[in-house]
Structures are given as structure tokens and as C-alpha cells.
């Protein structure tokens, strides 16, 4: 029996050393150590041995099994290392080769302008807010001191939907929603898309972008409004002349419009500025007491100012663009300039 075990061990170790891959090695393991393997067959003959020899033979079998298993593990590690080396060679990267060119993305000029405007007002302590683009007539008109029979509704050709809904004509509607849910003091800026039934021209579009500004606190004055917007125009346009001219909005009183000198003609008058020398960028004013009452604020205790500015107009001034329609054409020749 011992001679048979020694011969089996030598045969197994030789086969293991010569195994060229893991598949052959696994086949050798099953052939020698499997349930129907050669070692199991020898163990089956132990029943015919005298009782006093069985412990000795059992110990020899365990030694052979341990040596074969040790050789199998060592050869498996060796073959796995070889596979890793071959894979590393096959997948080696030439670090001197040029990489794939991925064209860098760019911000659309309207997005870049919006981000720049928001950065200015966030730096002044304002928080960014947002609201739905499909609005109720209440939030778009009534709560902003524009009842159904108010003549100011004729000033805005609105996209009316069903069930008393509209495409919002201004981001001012977010003022109401925010004040309903938050007590003063309030300082928010609201960038967003708005809709009006305007004719498409070089200065007007039925879909455009606004940024709304609202500040509510005790003892806020028109001087605070003027100072805030003057600082904003200086941050955006430098020392270019700015003017505030009286205007009318149903939700502010007094009201004004903010114009920046046209940079295409330096105030001399051109087609872009309708030969006025100025480009309107914002409407503003002190919040009407009726608006405060609509949201449950006491107009005797708080005051506030609001402003709404056209992002397209500001982008036109920043980038010397004389036609608003260029923003919406998706012309890469235009967009790649920014």
C-alpha cells in the first residue's frame, strides 16, 4: 500500500508541474483527489487491511493528500500570476500616445448671463427662488394688484390655457408664492422663462427670460432700490450711463424703468435701441400695499421693492449682440463665440 501511495504521489506531482493552464490543473485535481479519483480508489482498499495497519496507512494517505493539495495550490498561484502578466502586456497603454479629443462644452450665453446676474445678487444677500411656468390667473394677475377688469391686463398679451391657467407673463408670480410661505424679511431673486404674445423682432420674442428681484423688510426705501440696481449695473456694465425714468406697473408704486446706454451706438441712436440711445433692461418700483395684503403682510409694518429684468437684453449689451433671435437659432457658428 505504501509503494502504491508513493507512486501515486510522484505521478500527481509530475502531472501538476507539467500543467500548462488552470483547466488542465483542475482536471488533475479531480483525477487524483475527486470522489472517484485515484486516491479515493486506494482508500477503498483499506477495508481489506488488518486492523492494526489501518491507522498507519491512513496517516500516509493524509500526508500524500496534503502534499498533492499543496502542489496544486502552488501551481494554481503560478498559473494565475502568468495570466495576469499576459493580460498586463496585452492591455498595456502607451502613455506617449495622444489622447482622444473631447470638445469642451460651453455655456449658452443666456445661461452664462443668468449665472453672472445671480452671482451679483447672491453676493448682496439674496436667495435664489423658483416657481411654475404654468400659472393660475390669480398668481399671475390678481395677487399682483391686477384684477380681471384692470386696464393693465391689456398691456400684456397672454397665452391663456384652460381652467384659468396661463403661461406666466412674468416671474413676479413667484413673489406671491414665496411671500405666502415665508415671513419677512425677504430677499429673493428669481430667474426663469416667461411667455408673451409678442411679435418676433430683433428686440422681442414670445418666449424669453427674466430675473425677478424682491426685497421686503422694515424701512426699505426707493433709495435702497436705486442703490441696489445701480450697484448691479456697475458690476455688469462698468461705468456705462444708466437712467431711471418714471413708469407704471400695477404691482409697484412708485414705478420706474431702468435703461442702460446703448453700446452699439454709444447713445447716438440706432435700429437696436429704436433710435433712442438707450436699452431698457429692467422695470422696478416699491411694492404696492395691495400686494402685501394679498399675502398676509401688514403694509403698515413692512415695505419692499421689486424689479424685473430681461436677461436677453442684458446679454445683448454684454456680448454686443444686436438681434435677440440669434439666441434661439442653435447656430454653432454663433454659440462657439462665447
UniProtKB/Swiss-Prot annotation:
Gene3D superfamilies: Bira Bifunctional Protein, Domain 2. GO terms for molecular function: ATP binding; magnesium ion binding; phenylalanine-tRNA ligase activity; tRNA binding. It is an enzyme of class 6 (ligase). GO terms for biological process: phenylalanyl-tRNA aminoacylation. GO terms for cellular component: cytoplasm. Keywords: Aminoacyl-tRNA synthetase, ATP-binding, Cytoplasm, Ligase, Magnesium, Metal-binding, Nucleotide-binding, Protein biosynthesis. Its cofactor is Mg(2+). Tetramer of two alpha and two beta subunits. Belongs to the class-II aminoacyl-tRNA synthetase family. Phe-tRNA synthetase alpha subunit type 1 subfamily. NCBIfam families: pheS. This is Phenylalanine--tRNA ligase alpha subunit.
